[in-house]
Amino acid sequence: MKFCPKKISIEEATKDGIKLNFDQMNNGEKRYRLVGPDGSGYCRTLGSNKGAWQNSHYHKAATEIYIVQSGWIIYGEIDHSKNCKLNYLKEGQSVTVLPFVHHNVFMSPNSVVHTVKCGETDRGADWFPSEELDDYTKSFSEEDLFKLFVNI
């Protein structure tokens, strides 16, 4: 049988419960989301021309996987011992974030990150702010991060 997939229209995808959601965030990032009826989905995030932190948060049900396509990110989290830590991820690297792990991401200028969100996320909003982690991560400027992670 010849491989000849049929294109699916946005209207047909919408009937299947698939939603498109495109936003520009306050930090200049552009996010292009594809979300299923169960709340799981994919997001392609384009960093702005200036590196910036996102907003610290956690999920009660969702697992997220961040994949660095280009550029680099700093991934911050509060671990199970309640310690704040930062990790540098470069092109081709990824991190998996489990439910209830408070996390944040600093995206380098013009970076591209893919995020996959899965789990039982169809019970309403599953995004909860983490002021404690914001206080920690947002105290680091891009210059500070360069000093901490010399190999950037």
Q: How would you name each of these model-derived features?
A:
Residues 61-79:
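Glycine- and acidic-residue-biased ligand/ion/polar-headgroup-sensing regions
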Residues 79-100:
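Short acidic-glycine-tyrosine-enriched beta hairpin
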